A protein has these predicted regions:
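Short amphipathic beta-strand starts and helix->beta connectors
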Residues: 70-72, 112-115
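A short glycine-rich beta-alpha junction/loop motif
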Residues: 79-86, 115-143
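Short coil/turn segments at secondary-structure boundaries
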Residues: 18-26, 114-115
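A short beta-sheet element
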Residues: 33-35, 46-104
Length: 148
């Protein structure tokens, strides 16, 4: 069934605090503003911040909204997110399924991005993106198959 991303998840766009609050002494929350430390599934951290405006929580999907648009990682810690990321939290689908459906539709998100030099996607375009969403049983099967 076709649904928008906003119907199956909540989208929080990142916002960068002043760099005066950044550190590499692990004070405050880990801070990500793009995909430079993304791994295959989870990011690593090289910057922390003692002040933040926007956050991601364990289980959220981290989604790049600036070039490259559409890279995803799973959030396993409470972190601060900057302008290059959105935190997407599943509301009506399985969290791990949300990760897979976003990953599978990366080219669709890239096509919806704009910008002549640096591609980006805004919250409205992201939340209104139409996705083919599987039933709860199919989601469970997909998650189980992908984890195996």
């Amino acid at each position: 069934m076709k649904q928008t991303l906003g119907q199956i998840a909540s989208v929080t766009m990142g916002q960068s605090p002043s760099s005066n609050f950044y550190n590499n002494e692990q004070l405050g929350l880990p801070f990500l503003q793009g995909c430079t430390t993304f791994g295959r599934l989870y990011p690593t951290y090289d910057t922390w911040t003692t002040f933040y405006n926007k956050e991601a929580l364990p289980g959220d999907v981290l989604f790049t909204v600036r070039a490259p648009v559409g890279d995803v990682n799973l959030c396993r810690d409470h972190i601060a997110i900057g302008r290059g990321l959105a935190s997407i939290r599943a509301t009506t689908v399985l969290p791990r399924y949300l990760f897979y459906i976003l990953e599978a539709n990366k080219s669709k998100f890239q096509s919806a991005s704009s910008g002549t030099i640096y591609q980006s996607i805004n919250k409205d375009k992201l939340a209104n993106m139409q996705l083919e969403v599987h039933s709860a049983n199919e989601q469970q099967h997909i998650v189980g198959t992908r984890r195996a």
